[in-house]
Amino acid sequence: MDKVAQYKQIARELLVEDSQTGTMIEPSIRRQFIGDDENGHYLLYHIGWWDQYKRQYGCFLHLEVTEDGKIWIQHDGTDNPIAIRLVRQGVPKEDIVFGFHAPYKRSYSGFASMEL
């Protein structure tokens, strides 16, 4: 399996697992996984209602696997940093890009410091 396909599989597996586990503060709010293997986008959303009056909808985790073999973390709103979990799955730090940081800050992260 080539690196891009492997990274897509890892991203999908981690986010599917997250969509099925964990506890929500409000039972009426659910997690939804959205995966696009063709374009390499993997997202987790919160969807539902808080106290029947406040709509909850938003992406809290977005990974993008690019054709150059990098995993871009576009957003990580989790308590368990996805970058650490990717490293534990065998993804080298130089293949993980913090897309949510400005390009000039990325070189200080210890991870890849590329521009999109």
Give the positions of each predicted feature:
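Terminal domain-initiation and capping elements
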Residues: 1-116
